[in-house]
């Protein structure tokens, strides 16, 4: 399938095209007059007429994968030297401090959306300094541990989430199950990117996850 790829962070023309359409979030897929916001496998399959079911992790798998992924992200975050907090990620134009925080904040915002009934575009890009203050990687990792504890309690506690609950999001309506699954895939994708950034800095991750650990989680095929 032929397509045009736009990079709004490095290509002003691509950014201008989105703004002219009234779009202020990425990623976004435009096909004719239709727009799909975010990495949304269900809507992308519908848009392009793709056959087959879009996998969404079941409850037990989701709990297991969240624990595996967020614990690995905490390990990797703790390995980063303090002088890397302001290192700018080449493809993302955001600091490594903000990037690592983002790995953990997306699941937290998904849980928050369950309580307030809405997941906004502002939820997807919070700055760690607005939430945690001027902290380092250790504090971000501790935040990740707190988020994991909340996720496990919400999914596997005595009063688990109603995963069929419908929520309003900037991507359209989603069930709580879909939103938690998307947040999990988002954390996986960014963990893979973090491993690449660590490699660029000559840092070898401790007990890194491999593809087998990511089985059953839907993520984009391209690293960036």
Mark where each language-model region is:
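Short, contiguous alpha-helical
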Residues: 84-129, 168-224
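C-terminal structural segments of small proteins and small subunits
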Residues: 34-36, 40-46
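Thiol-based oxidoreductase modules, predominantly thioredoxin-like and allied folds used
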Residues: 1-14, 25
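A short, hydrophobic beta-strand/beta-hairpin element that forms part of a small beta-sheet core
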Residues: 25-37
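Small-residue-biased structural context
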Residues: 70, 78, 149, 201, ...
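Acidic/histidine-rich alpha-helical segments that form the ligand environment
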Residues: 66, 70-76, 131-167, 174-193
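Non-globular targeting/processing and membrane-anchoring segments
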Residues: 6, 43-113, 126, 165-167
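A short, structured beta-strand/loop element
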Residues: 17-23, 112
């Amino acid at each position: 399938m032929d397509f045009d790829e736009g990079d709004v962070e490095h290509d002003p023309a691509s950014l201008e095209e989105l703004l002219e359409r009234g779009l202020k979030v990425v990623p976004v897929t435009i096909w004719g007059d239709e727009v799909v916001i975010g990495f949304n496998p269900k809507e992308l399959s519908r848009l392009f007429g793709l056959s087959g079911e879009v996998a969404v992790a079941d409850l037990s798998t989701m709990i297991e994968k969240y624990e595996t992924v967020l614990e690995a992200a905490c390990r990797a975050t703790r390995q980063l030297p303090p002088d890397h907090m302001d290192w700018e990620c080449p493809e993302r134009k955001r600091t490594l401090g903000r990037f690592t925080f983002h790995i953990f904040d997306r699941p937290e915002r998904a849980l928050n959306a369950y309580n307030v009934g809405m997941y906004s575009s502002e939820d997807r890009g919070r700055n760690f300094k607005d939430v945690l203050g001027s902290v380092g990687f250790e504090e971000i990792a501790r935040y990740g541990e707190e988020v994991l504890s909340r996720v496990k309690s919400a999914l596997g506690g005595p009063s688990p989430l109603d995963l069929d609950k419908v929520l309003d999001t900037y991507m359209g309506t989603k069930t709580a199950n879909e939103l938690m699954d998307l947040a999990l895939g988002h954390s996986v994708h960014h963990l893979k990117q973090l491993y690449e950034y660590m490699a660029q800095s000559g840092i070898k991750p401790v007990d890194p996850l491999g593809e087998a650990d990511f089985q059953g989680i839907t993520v984009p095929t391209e690293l960036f």
